[in-house]
Every structure is written in structure tokens, then in C-alpha cells.
Amino acid sequence: MELHIIFLILGGLLIVLLAGFSIYSARREKSRIFSNTFTTRQPATPIKNIVTDVPATLDPLQYGQNPVPTENESESETGHSVQIQQEVENSLREIKINLPVQETAEYTQTPLNTPIYHNQPAQPTFLQTAPPIEPLTIPTVEPIQPETTSVLEQSLEELERQAAERELDLYSDASVRIELAKNSIQTPIEEVAQPESTVITQNNIITLYVVAPEGQQFDGHYVVQSLEALGFQFGEYQIYHRHQHLGNNDTPVIFSVANMMQPGIFDLNNLDSYATVGLVLFMHLPSEGSDLVNLKLMLKAAESLAEALGGFILNEQRELFNETDRQAYFARVS
């Protein structure tokens, strides 16, 4: 316990000594700073009254001193101040500001909205005048006379009539095209006497049409490829025939395919430029073998061609072929 008390006393003494030393050193530093800034030492030589030319009005105030002027000094000071004021006024009158004549002229003549350049000569200004704008004249449109309208109507009617005639020529009857194809053959045909002559009528021919969509045509290469893929053979009258036995041209023809466009033939030498609006399939009655079987084969061939070429099947009246037409065709050969 005694050692503990002794250590506490020693610690307190050390703290007191440190605090006192710090206070002493702070005061000493403060006194040193103030001793360098302010001094109370009297000047070595006393300041004497020196007479200057500065008037009493311009003499700075002397703080802490209140001299008592005498009568002579006050009179001399007033006279001296009056003299100084007169000299100042005279010097002010003599002061004149002289500007060069050219510069003053520039300052007076130059407008405010233009920049002033003293060292550069005046530049000439050029005025550009726009060409006069002429008034726009709008031409007057004369109304169409009734006579001109009637001429246009007549020309339109004539064009429609010619288009209808061309369409009739394209979709001409199959029997007429077959006759034309027969007449086009230049080789002479010897007449053979037959015991019985048969007259071919419309009822003895069954016809189907495969036509392209409106405004389109079948390409010649696709037509030939499709026909040959279905077993048709190019032969007599320059058209394609379907023989009773596929691949055997010596067997009888059961039905044929012709071009709807005149003269109804297939020009294999010019397939690049060949195109047609449709094909016509026809079968003569009676045919070789069963007419019903041959008719079913022709219907199947027409459907395959329409699917391959992207066309439509029409009946003999050039209407869309439907189930009713199918039954009517079967009734004709039964």
C-alpha cells in the first residue's frame, strides 16, 4: 500500500511539472512574438517641425496630438493655402486634352453599328441586288370536249372487242385444232376405201382442259417434262399421245394432249420461247379397250398435270370441273 501511495504522489508531481513547463514555454513564445511586432523604444532623434509645401487642409490628422497654433503661424498658413489653391486652379485651366483630327473624325463619323479599325483603311462595300421575281403563270387546262370523250369510249370498246376475239381464238374448240393439225401435214395421204364410213361428231369426243391462272402461262419446259413423266409420247401431228401400253409406240392411242393455242402443236425446237395458256386432253369414242378405264386414266392425267403446273381443270363448256361433271362423263361411256 505504501508503494502504491508513493507512485501516485510521484505521478501527480510529474503532471504538475509538465503543466507548468508547458504554460511557461507558451508565455515565453508569446512575449517573443509581440516583442518583434511592437516596440516602445523612443526614436533616436526627436521629430522637429519641418516646413513643407503641403497645405494645412491636406495635412493628415495627427492622432494623439493637439497643437495650439499661434497668430503668426495661422496667418502664414492661410495665405499659403490660398496661394496653393490659385496655383492648382491655374494648372487645371492650362490642362487640355488634344486628340488627332483623323481619330476624332472617325469617332464622330463612324456609325455605332459598325466596328472601328484605326490601323486599317476603309474597305469598299459591294451591294448585291437579287434578280426580280417574275410572277408564276399557271397554264389553264381546257376542259375535255364531249367529242374527245366519245372517241376515247369508242377506242376502249374496240380494244375490249379485240381482246374478246383473241380469247376466243386461244380457247377454240379442240376438234377444230385437230383438223388444222391434220391439214398442216404436207405428206399426201392415199384414200383407202372402207366398207363403212363413220362420221365423227361432238358426241364422239370427250374433252378436258387444263388452263393456267388468269394472266399467266405454262412454261414450255415444265409442260414437256410433266407430259413425259406421265407416259405421254411425242408423235403424230406434233402432239403428245398416251398409248395403250406405256413405252410402246406401236400400241393404239387411247387419248392425246394438244396445245390450246393455235396451231395446237408443241414446238420442241423452241422450248425456250414456248409458252401456252393451257392444254386440251381429248379421247375418241369408241377407244381401244374399255372406254370407262381409258376415261379414268385421262381424268387422272388431267389432275396430275393441273397439280404439277399449278392450273385448273375445265369441262367441255370451259367451266370448273366438279363431281357432277365427272358423273356425266362416266355416264357417256357406260
Curated annotation (Swiss-Prot):
Q: Which residues lie on this side of the membrane: Cytoplasmic?
A: 24-334
Please give the Gene3D superfamilies that the UniProt record associates with this protein: ZipA, C-terminal FtsZ-binding domain
| The organism's place on the tree of life at top rank | Bacteria
User: What InterPro entries does this protein map onto?
Assistant: Cell_div_ZipA (IPR011919), ZipA_FtsZ-bd_C (IPR007449), ZipA_FtsZ-bd_C_sf (IPR036765)
Q: What keywords tag this UniProt record?
A: Cell cycle, Cell division, Cell inner membrane, Cell membrane, Membrane, Transmembrane, Transmembrane helix
Bilayer topology annotation: Single-pass type I membrane protein
**Residues in compartment: Periplasmic:** 1-2
Question: Where is this gene product found?
Answer: Cell inner membrane
GO CC aspect terms: cell division site; plasma membrane
- Residue ranges annotated as transmembrane are 3-23
GO BP of this protein: division septum assembly; FtsZ-dependent cytokinesis
Does the keyword section mention Lipid metabolism? no
Major subcellular site: membrane
* SMART domains from the UniProt entry: ZipA_C
Summarize the protein's role. Essential cell division protein that stabilizes the FtsZ protofilaments by cross-linking them and that serves as a cytoplasmic membrane anchor for the Z ring. Also required for the recruitment to the septal ring of downstream cell division proteins.
What family is reported?
Answer: Belongs to the ZipA family.
What is annotated about its quaternary structure and interactions? Answer: Interacts with FtsZ via their C-terminal domains.
Supply the name of the protein.
Cell division protein ZipA
Task: Tell me the name of the encoding gene.
Answer: zipA
